[in-house]
Amino acid sequence: MEHLHTTICALATPPGEGGIATVRVSGPDAYGIVGKIFAPVRQWKSVADAKGYTAMLGRYLLNGAEMDECVALFFRAPHSYTGEDVIELSVHGGTAMADGLLEALITAGCAPAGPGEFTRRALENGRMSLTQAEAVMEVIAANGRQGAALAKSALDGRLAKRIGKIQTALQTLNAHLTAWVDYPEEDVPELSDAAFVGTLTEQKAALDALISGYSAGAVLRHGVDCVLLGRPNVGKSTLLNLLAGFDRAIVTPVAGTTRDIVEQAVQLGSVRLNLFDTAGVREVGADGDAIEAEGIRRSWRKLDEAGLVLAVFDAAQPLSDDDLELARRCQGRPAIAVLNKQDLAGETDVPRGTLEPYFKKIVPMCARDAVGLQALTDAVADLLGTAQLDPEAAQLCSARQLAAATRARDALAEAIAARQNGFGLDAAAVCLTDALQALFDLTGENASDATIEEVFETFCVGK
């Protein structure tokens, strides 16, 4: 960043109306600049003498005029978020007072902070690792408590520690291997195949566990797009209203009431579902309703875009050709068959065996009476993998981390295969070096400037 070593300021709270607005100041001259625009209520106090982890009440000055009441929180380097001197100034919420405070600080010598610049300085000053820095935005953007807990575990350094253990084991192995290859005269004991392959296999398994949990972790943090599909009048809108907790969609006995997509975000257990209630899917002839036909085309498009499909069937009626077409289109997708209107169903109306080849889960329900809701909640969590995920455990929290972990895992797999296929230790050592490089990229120890810029370009100003 252009002014990494200047003193910067930015609004740290959301802009607009609110109880308070907080402006963060960080840098070598933070106390000097704030001292120019902050007048303590107790005049014998001064900003320059303020100790870390203390607060002071005063008013901020703009062009020499007292403006709003202001509370200053002081942090001394290196015991601050950025590792620098930091002061956080809180005034009444709203744009006027916050903008005035920013103007006063910039006039006094502050530079406006860029996106993520405070966290970038924390990284540069050793206050956090790159994986922790990435977790900052994940905590902010997390949907639901478990998603926030998952992101918080990375922010607390659990991911960095877990990767560190893998690195240490591989570095120890690599050092032994290097010594044996490069210094044969030193009588370094040769690694046995069992010890070499065993260590690689153990660390590959650790990476496999991290990689396999990524998708479920992403669901907990960000939610998943979920489409409700089914032929007309099977109860899709009733199910939407049940999940939403209020009448979001119009429900009538008339088939085809929903003609366009209805969107609603809901929390189902630990998972946030971005629901899309769609027009009933059925075969429409060439001379059919053009509006309905367009709604059906949009429904099928949503099927291709969704991360979860709830295919709704009328359990009180035999499966129609339209039902079977829907089932076929759901095959191979993360799809759950919801057998709705179970209260009206006979024993043989919808044979489960007909649907089982196409769906991961089948859930009987009566959406009108909220019967089967817990079973649906459990099925969604199990299908998406969130039921097996420990939100307190270390997890990968970005696509960049996933790519690096995958490269490391694949390199270890190649090293194992090299030994099993009779190649020498020197060939396996090349793969081991590649794995270590990928792990260094993951943690940021050897990350390029381009990688770091990529991480911080997604940050908001003030963080």
Where are these regions (language model features)?
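Switch I (G2) and immediately adjacent beta-strands of P-loop GTPase domains
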Residues: M56-M67, A72-R76, G256-D287, E305
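Glycine-rich, N-terminal phosphate-binding loop of Rossmann-like dinucleotide-binding domains
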Residues: S26, V91-G93, L243, T278, ...
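Gly/Ser/Thr-rich helix-start
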Residues: E17-I20, P28, E84, G94-T95, ...
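Inter-motif core of Ras-like GTPase G domains
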Residues: E292-A316
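Structural motif
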Residues: L275, L310-V312, V338
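C-terminal-of-GTPase-core extension/linker across diverse P-loop GTPases
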Residues: E2-P15, R145-Q267, L273, A286-D287, ...
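A glycine-rich (often HGG/GG-containing) alpha/beta subdomain
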Residues: M1-A149, S153, I336
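Hydrophobic alpha-helical scaffolding
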Residues: V91, V251-T252, I296, F313, ...
